[in-house]
């Protein structure tokens, strides 16, 4: 059988970040040790903010090559966006999510170790904790989307996916109660992670927070609430808190339950070759 050709795919990341030097790495893509494919990735900062990346992908046609590169690079971006907690939008064109590119006057300089760690985290989570990696994808969407309703749903989904995917694995959670639905699953996970409601970070003592936000989620997702100024304002008033709760929940779940936190001194992932380019 003829081997699929290898393509180069150009991708652009819009966001308040940059690299101080070009960066190149080779990463194993996919989880087939009997037939591994190594993807070359080269990245550079964009003066107005963001990154330009060229990713190699093996696929029978251009469309599938682009899709494969987006999934592969996007998972790394999910891990990176969560770590730096900044909106990072991935696209095929340099214009980004809006008609004209917005210049980011302040840009966090991303070190090469952060990029290495993000690739490694995406690879490890993809193999061992795919539900958690999917929740990071929703969290990144919550960071970059400009629609307040979509932003709320994305942050809620990030919480809900972890609760639904892992409550059965935590012995201290009341399994019979959790089976009644996502509100109970989230409640059980919060208790297991942080203790009683009075100790919950960002929402201490607010025992109505889960129920009220679940109701908001249901009204948005099912089109029950009219999309008027009152609804939008109400949702916007919830965004700051739900973002902080989602980030803290995912962070603590990763560290305390999954024990999958980043080691700042960790080396690059196995089967990778990294190089900082001098220009």
Residue ranges and their predicted role:
Residues 118-279:
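Amphipathic, oligomerization/interface secondary-structure segments
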Residues 1-113, 171-204, 252-279:
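Terminal, compositionally biased low-complexity regions
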């Amino acid at each position: 059988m003829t081997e699929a050709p290898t393509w180069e795919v150009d991708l652009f990341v819009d966001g308040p970040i940059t690299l101080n030097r070009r960066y190149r790495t080779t990463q194993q893509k996919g989880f087939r040790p009997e037939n591994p494919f190594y993807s070359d990735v080269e990245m550079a900062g964009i003066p107005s903010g963001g990154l330009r990346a060229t990713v190699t992908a093996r696929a029978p046609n251009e469309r599938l090559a682009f899709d494969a590169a987006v999934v592969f690079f996007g998972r790394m971006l999910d891990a990176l966006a969560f770590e730096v907690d900044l909106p990072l939008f991935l696209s095929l064109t340099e214009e980004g999510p809006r008609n004209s590119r917005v210049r980011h006057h302040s840009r966090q300089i991303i070190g090469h170790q952060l990029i290495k760690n993000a690739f490694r985290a995406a690879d490890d989570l993809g193999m061992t904790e795919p539900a958690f990696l999917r929740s990071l994808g929703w969290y990144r969407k919550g960071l970059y989307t400009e629609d307040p309703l979509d932003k709320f749903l994305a942050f809620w989904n990030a919480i809900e996916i972890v609760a639904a995917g892992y409550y059965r694995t935590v012995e201290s959670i009341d399994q019979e109660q959790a089976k009644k639905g996502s509100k109970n699953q989230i409640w059980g996970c919060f208790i297991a992670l942080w203790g009683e409601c009075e100790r919950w970070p960002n929402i201490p003592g607010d025992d109505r927070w889960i129920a009220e936000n679940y109701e908001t989620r249901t009204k948005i997702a099912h089109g029950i609430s009219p999309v008027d100024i009152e609804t939008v304002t109400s949702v916007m008033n919830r965004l700051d808190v739900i973002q902080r709760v989602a980030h803290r929940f995912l962070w603590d779940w990763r560290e305390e339950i999954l024990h999958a936190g980043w080691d700042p001194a960790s080396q690059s992932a196995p089967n990778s070759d990294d190089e900082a380019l001098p220009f």
